[in-house]
Amino acid sequence: MSKYDFKKIEKKWQNYWDKHKTYKVNEDPNVPKEKRIYILDMFPYPSANGLHVGHPEGYTATDILTRYKLLNGFNVLHPMGFDSFGLPAENYAIQTGKHPKKITEKNIEKFKEQIKALGFAYDWDREIKTHDVNYYKWTQWIFLQLYKKGLAYTKEIPVWYCPDLGTVLANEEVIQTPDGPRSERGFHKVERKPLRQWLLKITKYAERLIRDLEEVDWPDSVKEMQKNWIGKSTGVEIEFLIKESKEKIKVFTTRPDTIFGVTYLVLAPEHPMVDKITKDELKPIISKYKDKEILKSDLERTSLEKDKTGIFTGAYAINPITKEEIPIWIGSYILGTYGTGAVMSVPAHDERDFEFAKKYNLPIKQVVSQTGTNEVLIKPFTENGISINTPTEFNNLKTIEVKTKVIKWLIENKMGQEKVNYKLRDWIFSRQRYWGEPIPILFDDNLNEIPLNDDELPLTLPDIENYKPSGTGESPLSKIKDWVNVKRNGKIYKRETNTMPQWAGSCWYYIRYLDPHNEKEFANKEKINYWMPVDLYIGGAEHSVLHLLYARFWHKVLYDLGYVNIKEPFRKLINQGMITSFAYQDENGILIPNDEVEKKDNKFFSKKNNKELKQIIAKMSKSLKNIINPDDIIKEYGADSMRIYEMFMGPLTDSKPWNTQGLIGIFRFLNKIWLIKNKELTNETPPKEIISELHKTIKKVTEDIETLNFNTAISTLMIFINELLKHEKNYLKIFRPISIILSPFAPHLGEELWEFMGEQSSIFKNAKWPKYDLNSIIDDTREIVLQVNGKTKDKIMIKKDTDEKTLKKIAFNNQKIIQNINNKQIIKIITVKDKLVNIVAK
């Protein structure tokens, strides 16, 4: 009797797939559109740390679906590549003294080795790397299309500059902390600094980026995050005349009904009217205030927690409806980049205005209340309500009615117009770093921009020794004079020395997979039409705003230019949950590294002081030493065990803690299948009961894969395998279909079993997914509830009349039950036949 030698089996089939290019795909014109599918993982950044067990979760999910679709006769595109430009490689290069290109390519080799060891069905002939010159040539080409369309421009703006990283960061790459703004990557201090930057006019696409979310099957949470980031506001733009002047100040508001409660105007420090209206005696102090405030971040200035500051300009405006004179202030909490850079302040009905008015003793006039009567205002009333203290024609009306009447009055009197505003800012697209795509633009002596011609691409990143940041805000490329200075038509021009951000290459990589070796165009249109859109895109929720928003923007530009055939690139999006790990906390809440923890009698103690620790679930991190390396898992249990365990841990979209005990259970499951394989193989007709169970299993596994409920599909397979073990013989009519439906989850074992049954070629080329027959199914299953302390944790299907001992065993092997009773004392177990198992624990 042979043993399950997973190391030998997995190496054998990985070599076979490589040699025979089993997963190579082409654009077969005979395959109808409904039988084509494009399944995509968010490609990884190849860090020096390699993969951890969290990476393969999404990859395994797409791989299972890919193999399932192959077995159902689909033409499947399932590629992989590497997002290999960007700051991390450059920072690591600076730390180690090794060139970022060498580091990156070494890391990619390691990643590929790890990915291949997990047996994923990628078409490696389509591999892309964003730092490859044959790839970034087309990133540069797309940038030039944006430039020619008027969507790329330069401007000197206050930007986030990180001295430690030596580069400018986009707003999205900066986080606010109690100690001030920090870089998201590396947690370095950042400051505001005026620099000439490239920007992309993503704001031109704001409305479409919101509207077209209706066309995609994405999680509602991701759609909301994108909508909130874009920040659409519908309101009215109102003109306020300045007293004793012909000048006007325009303000944007979403609450025109509150115009009767305006007691002052506030301008952003950078508003162009500030210098015009400020009284001479106040100009020195206001100039100093302006210089200080405009270097602060948007978040610093607008945060509700921050103290609001301001200065009176000495000027007054006239309320267009009430004709009241109101003072004009400048205030830190108003941004020049949002709306008009001016706000009509209604402190009775806005939190920030209320704080500002209280601080500077400005009038507070209530014009809306919940009941339609005056109320004592402890805090501003910001809801809709009934108008009060307003002219007769507007008084005692609901908010929506007042809004309508005010807008109508303003439009008729040419003092306002309806308007839509967005919080979204143009995308800062340049970085003062080396390891990125060179921007294909020249400048003459007058700083006029000259785009490179298509035949001058790629503009190759020069191979240099000193790629450290200059410290002045200039790129390291600025020091390479023979690269920077370009002679053309007898004149000397200078190259743009900034590089593109790390997001550039990932904005369009899903298109290059369709035609990765094309030297004449970024992708052949027929191939784009054949495969697009991406049918399923799986990746982390951390990319909900940046990558997905930027990729959608570039795609829409390419759509407008006629290069792609659909409006949205990713039809369906799934965010896999995070795989966490156990961590240990002392009495002060401090996390203790795992190698300083020991277990005694199901409790955890510090090795240093023997004090008891609390076990919690936390994100894997190097400092806590709780990162699980997939190489170790594969070596000990095999790739198939790891793949199945990651899918069995819980629903794909849930976060769940890694528990090696659960992995051991999966390893036993695969060994059970091997035990069945070792039994006498027979062509005899199986008993009706087994045939019924087989068709139930095929039905459930089929439905679960289609809906990406892999954990319940695996559970169903486990139940059926346990059933088969009870029989002395191995029925070919059962073992053949069960091997096929197992193979997407455990492809190496699936191939080995297929060969064992006498087949010559790959199961994924030669087998067909089995059909279930409803007429063969005998309904002898029951749904039971699994509870902990009377609270339902899961519902599962079991065989009717399952005995109490088996019920308990099923409950204690259930992942959700394991998570809820971990480290608890079991008081008693209550079972009700065919209905429930309730574990009482404390």
Curated annotation (Swiss-Prot):
Its main location: cytoplasm. A motif ('HIGH' region) lies at residues 44-55. The keyword Ligase applies. SUPFAM superfamilies: Anticodon-binding domain of a subclass of class I aminoacyl-tRNA synthetases, Nucleotidylyl transferase, ValRS/IleRS/LeuRS editing domain. ATP binds at residue 622. One of its GO terms (biological process) is leucyl-tRNA aminoacylation. It catalyses: tRNA(Leu) + L-leucine + ATP = L-leucyl-tRNA(Leu) + AMP + diphosphate. Its EC number is 6.1.1.4. One of its GO terms (cellular component) is cytosol. Keywords: Aminoacyl-tRNA synthetase, ATP-binding, Cytoplasm, Ligase, Nucleotide-binding, Protein biosynthesis. The keyword Aminoacyl-tRNA synthetase applies. Signal peptide: none annotated. A motif ('KMSKS' region) lies at residues 619-623. It is an enzyme of class 6 (ligase). It is found in: Cytoplasm. NCBIfam families: leuS_bact (TIGR00396). Belongs to the class-I aminoacyl-tRNA synthetase family. This is Leucine--tRNA ligase. It comes from Borrelia recurrentis (strain A1). The gene is leuS.
